[in-house]
Amino acid sequence: MRDLEIKKYKKLNELAQSDGIVIFGEGTDTNIPLCELRQALGVDKKMYNRSFSELSIHDAVNVFDACISPIAPETVFIHIGESDITAFKGNHSNFDIEYRALIKHIREQNKKCRIAVISIKHTDNNPDVEEMNQHLKYIADSEKCEFGDLTVQKVWNPKATMQTSSFIRNMGFVHPIKTPKPLYDLIRVLFCSEVCA
């Protein structure tokens, strides 16, 4: 399955532009409606979803090189770990080492790349997921990445934001603001919207 996904993303990369925003995730991340959210919210950066149905942190560096490195992203949202819960229970330190190695690898490719580590959703109050999220927060903090905590129950309402954006444009601000949006705001839009819930 992953080989087909990699092949698809390599083909899409022929159309992609560099310096965009990339979601590097797994599971339900493959269904995030990037085009619609980007258009509705006036995000001026190109956005690409390079998520896989299943992806372990163990394979992440190789997959990054095949599918993401060629488009030289300005921002990467890493949302990996769901497939690693069993391995994490057995050995926390290997998970931490491989996650840090991925972040280091991304920075070696582009020193200015903004990186956000996204927590794993856990609706069933699984203590292993809770512990993994604590590790992800520590990794993000120690590696100077932003941390997107999806365990905080805040649902982003894209319709209200779209109405606000429309009002601002109608008041004479025709073009979206060109300054980079705070990563946490984008995390809320992409991973916590009613559309994706």
Regions found by a protein language model. Give the residues of each.
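Short, contiguous clusters of charged residues that form electrostatic/catalytic patches at enzyme active sites
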Residues: 58-62, 97-104, 134, 181, ...
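Active-site segments of SGNH/GDSL-like serine hydrolases
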Residues: 79-85, 107-131
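Catalytic His-Asp segment of secreted/periplasmic serine-dependent ester chemistry enzymes
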Residues: 123-197
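Residue-level recognition of beta-strand->loop/alpha-helix junctions
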Residues: 51, 119, 149-151
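Conserved SGNH/GDSL esterase-like catalytic core that processes O-acyl groups on lipids
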Residues: 2-97, 127
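Hydrophobic beta-strand segments of well-ordered beta-sheets in folded domains
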Residues: 21, 74-76, 114-117, 147
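Charged, glycine-enriched surface loops/patches
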Residues: 93-118, 135-145
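A generic secondary-structure signal
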Residues: 11-12, 63-70, 101, 105, ...
